[in-house]
Amino acid sequence: MAKKNPKILSIVLAGGEGTRLMPLTRDRAKPAVPFGGVYRLIDFPLSNLVNSGYSQVIVLTQYKSHSLDRHISQLWRFSTLLGNYVSPVPAQQRLGKHWYLGSADAVYQTINIIEDVQPDIVVIVGADHVYRMDFEQMVNQHIESGAEFTVAGIRQPIEQSSQFGVIEVDPEHPNMIKSFQEKPKETTGLPDNPNEILASMGNYVANTDALFNALSIDSKAENTKHDMGGDIAPFFAERNEAGVYDFSRNEIPGATTTDHAYWRDVGTIRQFYDAHMDLISYIPEFNLYNMEWPIYTSSGNLPPAKFVHAAGDRIGHATDSIVSPGVIVSGGEIHHSVISPNVRVHSWSQVNDSILFDNVEINRRARVNRAILDKNVVLTENSTVGLDVEHDLARGFTVTSDGITVVPKGTVVDD
């Protein structure tokens, strides 16, 4: 059992390739994908950990990690004199001539770092979800329950069970896990709601010695994917040593009734798009403006956004939108969209229901609808994106089954 006031080391699993987010992950790791105008996905778990009081953090990176490493190094600077740090740790082939074989193997390959720190408890979190969470509350329950390993759980629709680890709770001990299935094709719903499951959020708390033992056994096993959800969580569940933390009980200062216990997986283009649309209503599903639990980032030394021209049909304006620093809307129109820094929207152009990454330029009379434009995309005069699916596909753009067009980084759209 972990002691009270334990020493905590946090590990962020940031080595994911993010193939379902292509082409947004063509040139960057999934946790480095921009989100919400000025953030990157990695900012959400790191902000949650730091706001929880946990400031000894290592970030395990692997896939196309340059921009991610640079972002962490520039933003997350702590005073090492106080023993605080957020350190990116790339895959190092420390235990063999292979890269990370899975999330569990990634943690196992950092055992030397864990041994140097000598924590009582290890907090392990993913790097690609959008949410606020006080991890101290989860750690406190972990200690009180006597579990060796605790999984954070959230209710999700049963039809999404194949996307998550599914938790069955022990009815006699509601804080303990009876069974854990990773992405089952079929499962049963919860006793109080057969249309829902209790899904793993990919966040774990573990006693260090027990975690070492499980990872060591897993490293030698043959029938394993070396995965935290698929292998380590079931390992503890089978031994009646796994607890579950109900995320709906997590209380965040400044949270509203609307965004209490908000959590989104943004692993697909549609999920990524929908999570952005959650940000921009009058009472947003997820409130970026809660300064009692801030999401930290750095948008550089940029000037304020500017809107110019106000004559006839040439009016620079934005409605129901997030507009970031450095943006100039010069006689163009933006509606229901998220606009990242240094974007230019020129006269008589229109941007609707879209997400624009940094340094995008929308020239005169160009139109964008229901699209995601990666960094440095340029639309020439009179060009369009998102108005004709067949035309978008013919130009090599990604178009989802529900009509969201994605334009890769650096593309010049000239027709």
From Swiss-Prot:
Supply one GO molecular-function term.
ATP binding
Family matches, as SUPFAM superfamilies: Nucleotide-diphospho-sugar transferases, Trimeric LpxA-like enzymes
GO term, biological process aspect, one: glycogen biosynthetic process
- Keyword terms of this UniProt record: ATP-binding, Carbohydrate metabolism, Glycogen biosynthesis, Glycogen metabolism, Nucleotide-binding, Nucleotidyltransferase, Transferase
Q: Does the keyword Transferase apply?
A: yes
Q: Which PROSITE patterns match?
A: ADP_GLC_PYROPHOSPH_1, ADP_GLC_PYROPHOSPH_2
Pathway-wise, it operates in:
Glycan biosynthesis; glycogen biosynthesis
Q: Which InterPro entries match?
A: ADP-Glc_PPase, ADP_Glu_pyroP_CS, GlgC_bac, GlmU/GlgC-like_hexapep, NTP_transferase_dom, Nucleotide-diphossugar_trans, Trimer_LpxA-like_sf
A Pfam family the protein falls into: NTP_transferase
Q: What is its EC number?
A: 2.7.7.27
* CDD domains from the UniProt entry: ADP_Glucose_PP (cd02508), LbH_G1P_AT_C (cd04651)
- What function does this protein fulfil? Involved in the biosynthesis of ADP-glucose, a building block required for the elongation reactions to produce glycogen. Catalyzes the reaction between ATP and alpha-D-glucose 1-phosphate (G1P) to produce pyrophosphate and ADP-Glc.
This protein's assembly is summarised as: Homotetramer.
- Descriptive protein name: Glucose-1-phosphate adenylyltransferase
Q: Which organism is it from?
A: Bifidobacterium animalis subsp. lactis (strain AD011)
